[in-house]
């Protein structure tokens, strides 16, 4: 990451996680002058952290902009408990913002949460997930959960070859979710159908995005594209929009564009293998 920042001429800010169990960090790369930055860790409330900075934009209308970078816990297999975790993380984030100086700001990152009204291509995902299980790429783990095939150092080449034969870049297997074993049994043979997707989507909690909207934040992608799907996850099967850029109310009118790299109008083929999520780009005219 440091090498990438040096090559791009960007400052690199890295946020260590709140919990030692997390191996993932957050990061902000910027060419704008950094006035200050801080990594807020919340042990017991956040899995990762709230990495934020104040940037000098050089604009007369918005001279200083605050950016908050987050990566909320996934835990899709936990259903309501997983969403409750994300609500706790969001609460810690909003408390940080409330304590800080008031200024225009964005909250951006992987929220691992669905927005009210957004579609989820659940049936196509379950069909592919069950194919992974039949191919031995998803196996039964502990506590009745299914998980990606584990690596132990000696089997890396074999696991990589199996993923390649399946048609998925092996570097992306970190994004394969763990789900209760019963999900596989219930969805075996399920047809891919939009009506069934809408039905299944009704049972998914969407509290995190509702809470952000109640706090006055604007979903920049949805503001620019009221009807577009905007799927950001997963690159091996685009099925859901879980990555967002939210703008504070005073900043939202400055948003002029927002889009997913890897789809129109940014059909970059590298985006399909760089991560298990597609990048999201938002432009603001300050």
Short names for language-model regions:
Residues 34, 39-40, 54, 98-102, ...:
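Metal-dependent phosphoester-hydrolase catalytic domains
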Residues 19-23, 74-79, 112-118, 228-229, ...:
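Active-site environment of divalent metal-dependent phosphoester hydrolases
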Residues 1-77, 82, 259-260:
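Structured beta-strand-rich core segments of catalytic domains in phosphoester-bond hydrolases
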Residues 72, 110-111, 278:
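Active-site metal-binding loops of divalent metal-dependent hydrolases
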Residues 64, 86-111:
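His/acidic metal-ligating clusters that form di-metal
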């Amino acid at each position: 990451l440091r090498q990438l920042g040096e090559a791009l001429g960007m400052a690199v800010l890295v946020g260590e996680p709140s919990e030692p169990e997390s191996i993932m960090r957050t990061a902000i790369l910027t060419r704008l002058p950094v006035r200050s930055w801080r990594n807020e860790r919340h042990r017991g409330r956040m899995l990762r952290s709230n990495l934020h900075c104040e940037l000098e934009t050089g604009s007369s209308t918005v001279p200083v902009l605050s950016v908050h970078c987050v990566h909320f816990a996934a835990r899709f297999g936990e259903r309501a408990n997983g969403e409750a975790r994300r609500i706790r993380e969001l609460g810690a984030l909003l408390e940080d913002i409330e304590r800080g100086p008031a200024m225009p700001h964005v909250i951006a990152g992987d929220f691992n949460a669905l927005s009210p009204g957004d579609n989820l291509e659940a049936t196509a995902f379950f069909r592919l997930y069950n194919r992974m299980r039949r191919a031995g790429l998803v196996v039964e783990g502990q506590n009745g959960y299914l998980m990606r095939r584990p690596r132990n150092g000696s089997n890396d080449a074999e696991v990589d070859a199996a993923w390649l034969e399946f048609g998925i870049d092996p570097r992306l297997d970190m994004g394969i979710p763990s789900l209760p074993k019963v999900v596989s049994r219930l969805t075996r043979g399920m047809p891919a159908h939009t009506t069934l997707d809408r039905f299944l989507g009704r049972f998914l909690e969407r509290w995190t995005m509702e809470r952000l909207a109640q706090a006055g934040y604007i979903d920049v992608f949805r503001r620019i594209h009221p009807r577009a799907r905007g799927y950001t996850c997963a690159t091996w099967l685009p099925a859901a929009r879980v990555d967002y850029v939210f703008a504070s109310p005073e900043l939202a009118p400055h948003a002029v564009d927002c889009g997913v790299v890897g789809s129109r109008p940014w059909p970059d083929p590298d985006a399909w293998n760089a991560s298990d999520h597609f990048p999201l780009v938002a432009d603001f005219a300050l």
